[in-house]
Amino acid sequence: MLKRILLILSLFVYLQAGNNTDNPAFPNSFFQIGNNPAQYGLKNCGGLHGTIQSFDSKTYYDVSLNMGNFGSVRYRKDSTENFILSGGFPVLHNLFLGANYNFNTEEYSVGMIYTPFQYLSIGARLNNVFEPDFVNLGIGIRPFTKRLTLGYMFASPLNDDFQTTESNSYYYLESEIMDGLLLGAKYDDQQEEIILSAGLNFSHANIMLHKNENSQTASIGIYSKLLNKFSIPKTYHYLTLKGKYQKENYGIFGSGKNFNELILSLKRFQKSKRTKGLVIDVKDFSMGFSELLELYEALLDVRQSGKKIYLYSVNGNNATFLLASAATKHIVYEDGIYNIKGFGMIILYGKEFFDSLGVKINVERVGKYKSAAEPFIRNNMSDEAYEQYSMYLEDIKKIYVNAVSKGRQISKEKVREIIHNGPYTMREAKKKSFMNDFVYPDEISKYITKSEKIKKLKYRDLNEFNSKKSFIYNWQNPKINNAIAVIYATGTIVDGKSQISPFNGNISMGAETICTRLKVAAKDPRVKAIVLRVDSPGGSAYASDLIWHEIQKIAHPKKDKKKAKPVVVSMGNLAASGGYYISCNSNYIFAEENTLTGSIGIFGATLSIEKMLEKIHINTDSLSTDENALFKFAFYDPSETENKFFKKAIETGYKSFIAKVAKGRNMKLAEVDSIGRGRIWMAKDAEKIGLVDEIGDLNDAIKKAAKLAKIRRNTNVSIQPYPSAGYGIKIPFLNVVSYKVFSKYPLLSEIGEKYYSLRLYSDDENLMLLPFEEYEFAE
């Protein structure tokens, strides 16, 4: 490969090439550093660029530094060193302005770039703005593809009357004929010469060579983002599945990896003509069932497009087995364990523990299926809880079996048999033919080269297809007019701001955070519709109602109906109890096939430590001005009057819940009550009884929102969080440190999280909550 590169470079030197291709309409050209400060408005990526030129036995150089919206250039010409500081910013998504200052000449220059279309760019630069002495006017077009750019520039000095004098015209052709291979030409009308340019892009670097009759130039650039890399053979890319994947990242102190970007990278990888296959190294990763199914479908699409997928794991489990179903081959470590074992859940029950302490937890609930408080008042599952959880696990298994059967092209009965007889040693798994071969980690490349009959295998990072980590080749920033705001509402619903748990890194859904996001979207004139992605077991009734109220104001305003914006809910793994409460008044509800929803019900709990105080010989005495002054004092067991009031408050909250569901879903109160009382429903059943409108994913919800907002069908949409990832989320540094420590000790993490969740019960309020968060898959 190195010999091939050196050969090509030697040919490039032979080409008669030249530099100084500074068309102000070319904002992200590899053929020029760019003298138009407006180019920094695109905030493409950081980088360092150096050029050295030999002209008439003299040597000149320049060094430029790009820091996003700002940059600097230091260059030497005619024995003089100059230093220029530049900056640019977007006025609109397609209009950019900029200015720079030359510290040696003490001159200010300004520039403009306007890209009305992705295939057209117009640029201008005025030198020495207070005493203008030179102007550049340029235009660029991309008639067929962003790999081919044609351009024209008019350049002229200016006299004292601001009139052009000795005008000159330049004509440009720049192309990337294949990934990372750059060829270009420039015609100088005044000199009547053609200048040729050529270069190579590597992952984070670029080499350009130029030479004309009088000069020769070489330049090298280093970039913070990934470039289209030069590679002649079709390549294999590498993906390591490790860590916690989630739909929304929470900034540099967040606890997870961006799942959306992973899926988008796979889709771009699938469409690329320069890729041959994907190698997946499965480490310790975790994600919800909805995310696992989405990843499985994305990998299946890659395989069905004709690309090879090799999945490697030391051990295996249910998640590995599903993902391997979408792979071409599953290779493993010989002495590993394939932990396929079905689906189950464990819920801790602590009534005897609390009794032994003398602590009494008084629970009032509506509906026999409202089982969230049972772990505090029972020693085992109630019949109703057992019925519901069994149904849930069987439905999860059914969806899982269907997916494995589809990917492996074997019968569902065979999949059930494999699950029923698990777990397995890897040797047993190979005998049963649901994995392929034994390979040590350092022999993966050797195995693939032998299987694919190729001489040598070099990997490229799948991150090349990650839009946030890749160089921006487009001439426009994404247009956000007629936008659809995607707001992620994830975790247990609490009052205040969202924040991460110090024990397991999970996010809680703060009403203040979600309401703020909704308000920003409602006021943003560019946002025409909102998609609320709900993944929550519920939580605080008060916090849930605050979010419901904010959605009501947006989707169903009382006064000015014209200000209404459609709100579409996309349910993830869970949207139950309070999670359903915040969804019920939206304009349309999508649930995924595995979504658990419903649990329309409410409960409340109070704590009494009267017997505990007796055990440790602490006596209490009291006085009050009124009969009920000591309501909810933990030192005493609740009186009959207090219990009656407590029950009445819970029943009032339940009536309010079903009334809002009835209004939002256009149902009768009795109808909602009959399917409520805490009962959970899988998505297909929820669709049949009217709790959701349709089975579909986040993309389906976005399309529906666009339709309700009357946005044209071909509008580009984004699944990135609005207004931005982590917006309004409180991330205490100590919580992050604590999570990093507890993540190494799963048992302590689980116990700590149970204690942490008790904060919900400490407030004087009612709860809408499930006893578990979601069925999570982990390696």
Task: Label every PLM stretch briefly.
Residues 200-250, 344-346, 357, 362-369, ...:
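Hydrophobic targeting/anchoring helices
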